[in-house]
Amino acid sequence: MASPGNHAIVAPGWTRSEDGSLTRPLDLVENWLLARIQRANTPPGREAEGLTYKLKLRLPQDIDDPIPYLRRAWLVFRYVQPLIGAIYPPYSERDETGRYLVTVPLMDPEEWLRLSFHVNQGTQAVFRDVDDAGKIFQPRPTAMAYWFPPSSTLIIRSTHLRFDAVGIYKATNTFMLGLESVFRLGLDANLDCYTTDVKQPSLPPGIDYILGFPPQETPVPHRVERAVDELMRHWHHGLYSLSLPVREGSEDAAPANTQHLVTLFDEPTLEAIVAGCKKLGVSVSAAVHASIVRVWASFPQQQHTGARNMLIPLVANLRPLLDPKWVVPDYALGLCIFVVPFCLTGGFEDLTQRLGAVYSRDLSALPSDPAGDPVSFLELLPLYESREAAFLGSLPVAGCPPFRVPNLSSLGVLERYLARAYGKKGAQAPVCEIEDVALVNATTDPTIEFQLFTFRGTMRLYLYYNDAYYTEDFLAPVMEMVRDSLLQELGLGGS
């Protein structure tokens, strides 16, 4: 068996220390997200953008105590996906030039389990219940797993720097295959005997290396500068975006708890929504986003009469830009997203069609040069990242409305990444099954986060908010308005 701490294939860019740990500088995308986290208004001991991943499981009934199997599966997960054990800022160090580092320590199986796997029960309980686990995100040096026996739910909590939503859903498939293998082979098999979809545990290089970004001192072509200027214009127009009123007296309040609302669309309703979107020639994501904007535009901007536009932060998945060898289960974890701004100006008529046109384009081709030709992310990201950081660091801008536009993360059908059940083919019942999933992104300001995905034939639209700035009594009708707007726009009536 390969040594648990020295088994991974290490890509270029990593440096091995005397103690066996591996380090590399944060890449461009990680630095971009870290800057956002550091700009957030968070009290000491809390972190913006922290992720709480909820995995509700149905496990074999003939296993009296599943905890040893879950612990073993968590260890297998660390073995095949080393980045789950990576240490990011503020817990990692900087190099001699001041660059932030990500560090993957040598794996000590017992220490890994002692520090990162906990059973939330009795006197050892850290959280009151599963919902409580997503309310406040307190950073830890490594990813943490909490098992809730009463609800058969596994909670994974991590800084967003370690993975994005697509990454954790892809890696869930790896974890579940490992868990099924542990049930099948027992607790005493060597780590490399358990089977997952990972061919070889590996540490990927940073995005800078994969995408071949030029050195920082490389001159930027004029056409790229003009394309970045175009993207920045969307941000500047977005300064005059509409917003929802926050609760009275909360404008300068410290963040409290992340809460959520959810509306479900059952299978028949989802089929009707998909058919309605096809008839209009738009994606479901575009139709939902249009409904959110339509509801925001219906609120009077009494305190900020200059608000007239709506910024649409579009999440661009960078994976299609990567060489296929990097888009495999071995490299599922990591940060491969970026936010592209698009600002709606000139009124809010024909929203579904206008947003449908935006969503139908390759997000990486939204910026264009003076001739109207698209400019690839490969060319503009280094310059755009620094320009965007400078802009966001200048907020708030005097005379402009508060900058709190709603975000939508649309993840599609999760069965693209994971299965509903894992077990031996032909068995009467699966070994283990995923009953439900949810991913909470910690909100620490008045920004409202929407998350859209479909699993087990049901589409879920989550709304995440911080209760320092909004109440459930206010937002529950807003959520219902978004639902009704979507159904009415597609000719399906309300609710």
Swiss-Prot record:
Domain of life: Eukaryota
Induction: Expression is induced in loline alkaloid-producing cultures as well as in planta.
This protein's record includes keyword Transcription: yes
Subcellular location: Nucleus
Gene Ontology BP terms: alkaloid metabolic process
InterPro entries to which the protein is assigned, alphabetical: CAT-like_dom_sf
Chain's role: Transcriptional regulator that may regulate the expression of the loline biosynthesis cluster 1, one of the 2 clusters involved in the biosynthesis of loline alkaloids, potent insecticidal agents composed of a pyrrolizidine ring system and an uncommon ether bridge linking carbons 2 and 7.
Name of the protein described by the UniProt record: Loline biosynthesis cluster 1 transcription factor lolU1
Naturally occurring in which organism (per UniProt): Epichloe uncinata
